A protein has these predicted regions:
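Short, acidic/turn-prone active-site loops that include or flank metal/cofactor-
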Residues: 20-26, 427, 439-441, 465-468
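A glycine-rich, often tryptophan-bearing local segment used as a flexible ligand/cofactor-contacting loop or short
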Residues: 439-491
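Aromatic-rich peripheral "rim/lid" segments of glycoside hydrolase catalytic domains that contact
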Residues: 234, 249-310, 316
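Aromatic-Pro/Gly-enriched surface loop or interdomain linker
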Residues: 361-369, 373-437, 464, 477-491
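Beta-strand-rich binding/interaction modules
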Residues: 299-339, 346-352, 362-372
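Substrate-binding/catalytic cleft of secreted carbohydrate-active enzymes
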Residues: 1-252, 257-264
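Hydrophobic beta-strand scaffold residues
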Residues: 16, 92, 421, 459-460
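A short acidic, amphipathic alpha-helical/loop segment
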Residues: 4-8, 412, 444-452
Length: 491
């Protein structure tokens, strides 16, 4: 927490959660415990007059050996109760992340409510899903009760406290322009300048200008992948009227070790803001296809929801149309729906509606409009479905797959042709085509022995193995002169 940030949040009407920092690092040592508690209490005294501040949280992602120390956990709960007396008007939570079950009492859900001195171990559910994947996957929505954002938890405050750390590049051209115009390099300016030069070289070598126009257009297009993914998660939570808090992971990208973020380190929006803000509208129709690919001609099942923060209620007419890749639009369905309104901010309007998709291959747009009894347009929405026309005659010639052993492309090929799709090898005879579904960068790269040089000049790799996630309990040390180990799901 920072007073200058909270002052601005007060002006803008933003709500903030605040943490003291480093609280989890304090063990049983009385001196360190005094330091972190003093820091916590001073933070509360300093910031409690800010109306934008609504939650105090002690620890981000409580875990590791200290989380298994029941005596230490009990001490921390007492710290929390004492701090709550300084400002009983706010919610105070023990940790963010790692709640597991709705009806169980858990330390991970410990909370103190406003003007309530009782420590509750249920009623506050926060679980983090920060890891990717890199793109939205169609498996993330298969129906009203089969989707990534679904929950039947209706008894607790429900948070998704860290969602989707999706990697996208910074607006490197804009950063380079700002450094050039201001002459201010700072501590990292040369890093960004060198990265921009590398982008320029890649852009020209690959002749990307006819397709993307500029480096900035390219990086914004890549940023849109992340924005659309985050938006679809937010939409899923809102349209199902589930949950109370959604936190994008994260706001600002760190320069080296984590490239997720809405903005880069120079505060440039990484993608086009409209890609993200479509999903944050206060009122629209959420169009949710259960599959985003269809074999032409075919039918695609679609569910229609309303995101309703404008308190629409009563009878309305929902009309659905499909727009073909060449812009021709045809109405498919018109149906009367009833909207609840009030504190129902998301509602399923029409379920499992099968829409015929036929015509040329390309992107088909499913559109929905909601009108009142007077015919006035109140809300609308859209999504896209990729229509694909193919037959096995198109899969002629000799080919191979550069992918993983369980790649769905291989399964599809075998089902379509009755033949096995061989894995690519460098010693194969000339091929007509190759399907590539993985990066060449994940191929084994030999590390030269001289890279393992120790202080005394000996070329050897020293490997320390630990028993725990926090790298505190040493299991053993071994030496080798080459790296040839394979670890399931990474090291």
């Amino acid at each position: 927490g920072s007073p200058v940030v909270l002052e601005k949040a007060d002006e803008l009407g933003l709500l903030y959660l605040e943490e003291p920092g480093a609280f989890h690092s304090a063990g049983h040592d009385p001196f360190i415990r005094t330091i972190v508690n003093t820091k916590l209490q001073r933070m509360i005294l300093r910031d409690r007059s800010h109306p934008s501040l609504v939650i105090y949280n002690l620890i981000n992602e409580w875990g590791g050996p200290r989380a298994r120390d029941k005596e230490l956990t009990a001490l921390r709960m007492e710290d929390m109760k004492k701090a709550h007396t300084i400002d009983p008007s706010r919610v105070m939570t023990f940790t963010s992340g790692w709640a597991s079950a709705e009806h169980s009492e858990e330390d991970a859900k410990a909370n103190l409510l406003p003007f309530d001195s009782v420590l509750h171990r249920k009623g506050w559910f926060d679980n983090h899903r920060a890891a990717g994947p890199a793109t939205w996957e169609e498996d993330y929505y298969r129906g009203p009760k089969d989707n990534l954002m679904y929950t039947d938890n209706r008894t607790e405050i429900y948070l998704r406290g860290e969602e989707g750390a999706l990697s996208t590049p910074p607006r490197i051209a804009e950063i380079a322009k700002e450094i050039e115009q201001t002459g201010i390099k700072g501590w990292d300016g040369l890093f960004w300048k060198n990265q921009y030069e590398a982008f320029q070289q890649f852009f020209h070598e690959k002749n990307l200008a006819p397709y993307f126009g500029s480096i900035d257009s390219l990086t914004r297009a890549m940023g849109d992948v992340s924005f659309d993914h985050q938006g679809r998660r937010i939409q899923g939570m809102r349209m199902q009227n589930t949950g109370d808090v959604y936190a994008v992971n994260g706001w600002e990208a760190m320069p080296y070790d984590n490239h997720s973020g809405i903005v880069d380190i120079y505060r440039n929006c990484k993608g086009n803001p409209s890609t993200f803000t479509y999903y944050t509208q206060p009122l629209y129709v959420a169009v949710s296809p259960r599959t985003q690919f269809v074999h032409l001609p075919g039918k695609v099942p679609v569910d229609f929801y309303i995101v309703n923060e404008k308190n629409l209620s009563g009878k309305y007419r929902l009309s659905v149309s499909v727009c073909t890749p060449d812009g021709k639009e045809g109405k498919h369905i018109e149906k009367e729906v009833h909207i609840t309104g009030g504190d129902c901010f998301g509602q399923l309007l029409l379920e499992n509606c099968h829409l015929a998709i036929e015509g040329a291959s390309g992107l088909y747009q499913v559109k929905a409009q909601l009108r009142n009894t007077s015919g006035h347009l109140c809300a609308e929405g859209k999504d896209e479905v990729l229509g694909i026309y193919w037959d096995e005659k198109q899969l002629k010639g000799k080919g191979a797959l550069y992918g993983t052993p369980d790649d769905p492309v291989a399964t599809f090929y075998q089902k379509a042709t009755g033949c096995e799709l061989p894995a690519f090898r460098s010693d194969m005879e000339k091929l007509d085509w190759i399907v590539v579904t993985r990066s060449s960068l994940d191929a084994p790269q030999p590390v030269p022995v001289e890279a393992f040089c120790q202080k005394e000049g000996k070329s050897v790799l020293e490997l320390s193995l630990y028993k725990d996630d926090d790298l505190r309990t040493l299991a053993g040390v071994t030496q080798d002169n080459k790296i040839d180990r394979t670890f399931a799901d990474g090291a």
